[in-house]
Amino acid sequence: DAEVVQSLTGCTVEEWTRLDEPLAPDTAARREGVSIPRVAEHAERVRGVADDRETVIVEGAGGLLVRLDTDGGTLLDLTADLARTHPVEVVVVVAAGLGTLNHTELTVGALRARGLEPTGLVVGSWPTEPDLAERCNLVDLPRVTGVPLLAVIPAGAGSMQPDEFVAAAPTWFDGTDRAEHPS
């Protein structure tokens, strides 16, 4: 992901932990026999980066409550830790299909339970031919969570050429590139 983001956007990317298998970080680290930094260590590194930049994006793998370290620390713990010292905006990236309403409501509920109000939702991989559930979810996600839908990113966006990506990305946030959906 880091190389793709950097090649498409030209943004500076720092990656502190890379694991070989596409699994929850704690699981992948255990399987590889490596230890990963504790959430508190990640928080300090993010603070160091945030002091020199206007915007910092922190991406996790597997979801808000997936363990990031052997102590049971999660992305939610990291976010709450950072929010104590820096302004934090949380954008929840969600799936398009059946089951996303449940997953998204659970994620938003967990954030709110820690005093973190999500800024918005982003559908992370919108199919070229969305089914009924996917189309309905565009309406239902903000309705059931009370959180606005900020963007719908098409499936395969990471495979675009950088100039194509830069030209298309604004349409993902203004809704002009979305398939029609039922209301």
Task: Give residue spans per PLM region.
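C-terminal lobe/tail of nucleotide-utilizing enzymes
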Residues: 108-183
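Charged helix-capping and loop-helix junction motifs
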Residues: 69-78, 105-106, 134-139
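Structural motif
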Residues: 57-59, 91-93, 122
